[in-house]
Amino acid sequence: MKEMLSVGFMVFSIFFGAGNLIFPPLLAQNAGTNYPMAVVGFLTTGIGLPLLGLIAIVKVSGKYTELVEKRVHPWFRIITFGLLYLAIGPLFAVPRTGAVSFEIGIRPFLPVDFMAEGQYIYTAIFFILTYFFAANPSRLVDTVGKVLSPVLLLFLCVLFVRTFYAPIGEILPPIEQYIDAPFASGFTDGYLTMDLLAALAVGGLAISAVKAKGVTEQKAIYKTCIKACLVAIVLMGAVYTALAYLGATCPSVLGYSANGGIILSSATYVFFGDAGKLVLAFIIGFACLTTSIGVSAAFASYYQYVSDGRLGYKKLLLGATLFSYWAANMGLTELIRISVPFLVALYPIFIVLVILSLCDDLFQGSSLVYRLSIGMTLPFSIMDGLQAAELPLPGVHDFLMTYLPLYSVNLGWLLPALAGAIVGILWNQMHKGYQPA
């Protein structure tokens, strides 16, 4: 029990990133009275899939990239995991930490005519610190991170109690895509957490943590990790659901906000005044910084590894932090808007990979099943990404909108992926023992 709870809280802390706190309030603000169904969709991809990803990694003893290389193709592994580390690194996740900490912690205290200059100055300091600590690893960063996660959780608990005791306002009717498709909209909103990608990148930590507790037998490691994941599911589900309720009660009084950072900051001010905003700013700022340091270091380490050392760690780190600085200054709302099409196109590939790897024994690990299912997923997920970017292919878009179920809600890949897997399984049944080269 002790090992299960310890690892469960560790898994929770991995995914309990300050940057992800902005999404449930924004989703619920727009979903209004439909927010419960939207939250279920969000939890499916924001919590369920990452924890399935962890289980998939535990199942193969941490050797997940080797499984992908063997089942699909070496180049597929190189390209997809290269994109994964870019997404959770300098493309989106790292600049988002700088943008979120500015939006929540600094913007509320700046005069309007100094907003742009303030953002440039703050993010410069933020990413200089990111580079310095990532280039010079220190236990101080780990210690600060371990302290701040419980402090942030405690602050949010106080905020949640206040919200449930005396909500800011009434819940309004849904708007935009949440009127007709709250679950599907919440499902794709969950992509923005990028926690499935993070799970596949750092999932080996869960195995290491269990082994460090003295559990060495593979079956016992597997059981402990699954139980720990259930602990993390309960904690994360409670936090995200409470954040969603907070967001749903805000627009009737505070109006509609452009992003979740504004909602959190405004709600904190309503309940606790400037003192509350200062506390939240401090906690979020340092929590985002520790996340930025860890993820930037992981990105640089991965690309140094796959390049066989031809790309130096510090050069990669410098490039990542400079790019993150530029991207963060686009602003949080714009950064999220740009990331959506990329994630809508990329996420389905990893969803299919994780589900197939969990069901691997059912079709004897057939490479054909993997290749057909992913091969059918890829073109349709790209089409979904183009639609999310409002750049649909003429003719093709209209055809898919008419004849492909779920395409209108950016889930057009789902049935083709299932069809590819079924065809692969049936082919194997008719050709026992066949494996493609």
Where do the protein language model's features map onto the residues?
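Select transmembrane alpha-helical segments in multipass membrane proteins
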Residues: K2-V11, P36, P74-A87, Y120-I125, ...
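Helix-loop-helix connectors at the membrane interface of multi-pass transporters/channels
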Residues: L27, A99-G118, K211-A212, S292-G319
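Membrane-water interface regions at transmembrane-helix termini and the short interhelical loops
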Residues: K59-L67, F126-L148, A212-V215, Y325-I338, ...
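Hydrophobic alpha-helical segments and their helix-loop junctions in multi-pass secondary transporters
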Residues: P90, V94, L153-Y178, L196-L197, ...
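Membrane-interface loop-to-helix entry segments
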Residues: F133-T163, S339-I351, Y370-F380
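A generic transmembrane alpha-helix motif of multi-pass inner-membrane proteins
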Residues: A166, S366-A437
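Extracellular/periplasmic helix-exit of transmembrane alpha-helices
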Residues: V234-I263
